[in-house]
Amino acid sequence: MIIWINGAFGSGKTQTAFELHRRLNPSYVYDPEKMGFALRSMVPQEIAKDDFQSYPLWRAFNYSLLASLTDTYRGILIVPMTIVHPEYFNEIIGRLRQEGRIVHHFTLMASKETLLKRLRTRAEGKNSWAAKQIDRCVEGLSSPIFEDHIQTDNLSIQDVAENIAARAELPLDPDTRGSLRRFADRLMVKLNHIRIK
């Protein structure tokens, strides 16, 4: 089973993925960006694409590895990744579903103001690459193809994770961490996922 968490940059995908991972056993957070970074490092600058999702190889690789993992891993794969192009969505998620694999897809929605505020907490201002993608992402992700939509403006990470688990009918382990431990865990996730563009 796959839980795909989509959303604009700053919507809380990665934090939600790791919150679910801590409370779903067994589970694994699968990061499609890693293949994108690998492609970016191996392609000559003169022919490199601005968005690694534009490489058919990126989409084919992630589809293939997710298909293989779904067939061999008995836990839940949690995939935090923004996909805005319907054709890319269909090449990966649509194809996995067509072949009978269970993919629960959720899009975390938030206002532009909320997204900018969240991006600032990770040192990305209004002129950052992520901030410049907000309008494109919010518009594209509002399409019905990207349902199930979850409005997150007034939800905590814990609320969003519990909402996703309920919609996917997955029981979560209780969160026995104190507030300090929860804060430290989320800070570590944030620090481990800072991307320098």
UniProtKB/Swiss-Prot annotation:
Organism from which the protein derives: Bacillus subtilis (strain 168)
GO molecular-function terms, A-Z: ATP binding
UniProt protein name: Tunicamycin resistance protein
Record function comment: Involved in the resistance to tunicamycin. Binds ATP.
Cellular compartment(s): Cell membrane
Membrane topology listed for this record: Peripheral membrane protein
Pfam family, one: AAA_33
GO cellular component, one term: plasma membrane
SUPFAM superfamilies noted in UniProt: P-loop containing nucleoside triphosphate hydrolases
